[in-house]
Amino acid sequence: MAKHGKRYLEAAKKVDSTKFYSVDEAMKLAKETSYANFDATIEVAYNLSVDPKQADQQIRGALVLPNGTGKSKKVVVFAEGPQADQAKEAGADEVGSDDLVEKVQNGYLDFDVVIATPMMMAKVGRLGRILGPKGLMPNPKTGTVTMDVAKAVENQKAGQVEYRVDKQGLIHAPIGKASFDADKLAQNFDALRDVILRARPASAKGQYIKSVAVSATFGPGIHLDPLNLD
């Protein structure tokens, strides 16, 4: 079992591990238990009663949080013609086609999000070994393979987050920074909760949300009642 440092243990004393906190209480406590020497990310972790091995239970998607994430994203777009122009106008940090493919092949990875038009995916596919392990491959489910590249860029710049259930049935997603007001964190939490509830597979059995917790970077987990997330 990993040993925790003094600052973590001091933060953990503020959390009652035997109780469930309301959303508002949890957001305030996540801020209070943030002890990093930078503006920590507040993250939520859902443990879902799904089997990701089943195709119809692979929960994945994206949403624009009402108050953003507090993080500035660098966005690159693979597009040609009018879509390339639209991506530039929308604020993409880099736009290209074969030239951008070559640039990435030569080591360029200074970006957080990759967007592509459907026609460009054959070319982007050549970058699978580079982008795939970093979770950067464009995907229609997250709105990053689209003809409306301008909207996709705007969404990313506005604070879009992706969520995806892993092999253990867990979803981890950021909902803001420790510097956010607690009510803004709560609004972001509510938005993510709503899409996860709507994404429940028809074939999922039993209690859908088994547990949910929020925490600041390096901070202790703060548990909420999975049956009462209002």
From Swiss-Prot:
Claim: Phosphoprotein is one of the keywords in the record: no
Coiled-coil residue spans: none
Any GO CC annotation of this UniProt entry: large ribosomal subunit
One Gene Ontology MF term: tRNA binding
InterPro entries recorded: Ribosom_uL1_bac-type, Ribosomal_uL1, Ribosomal_uL1-like, Ribosomal_uL1/biogenesis, Ribosomal_uL1_3-a/b-sand, Ribosomal_uL1_CS
CDD domains recorded: Ribosomal_L1
Record GO biological process: regulation of translation; translation
A Pfam family hit: Ribosomal_L1
SUPFAM superfamilies recorded: Ribosomal protein L1
Gene3D superfamilies: 3.30.190.20, 3.40.50.790
Keyword list, A-Z: Repressor, Ribonucleoprotein, Ribosomal protein, RNA-binding, rRNA-binding, Translation regulation, tRNA-binding
Function: Binds directly to 23S rRNA. The L1 stalk is quite mobile in the ribosome, and is involved in E site tRNA release.
Record-stated family: Belongs to the universal ribosomal protein uL1 family.
Description of how the protein assembles with itself and partners: Part of the 50S ribosomal subunit.
PANTHER family: 54S RIBOSOMAL PROTEIN L1, MITOCHONDRIAL (PTHR36427), LARGE RIBOSOMAL SUBUNIT PROTEIN UL1M (PTHR36427:SF3)
Protein name, entry field: Large ribosomal subunit protein uL1
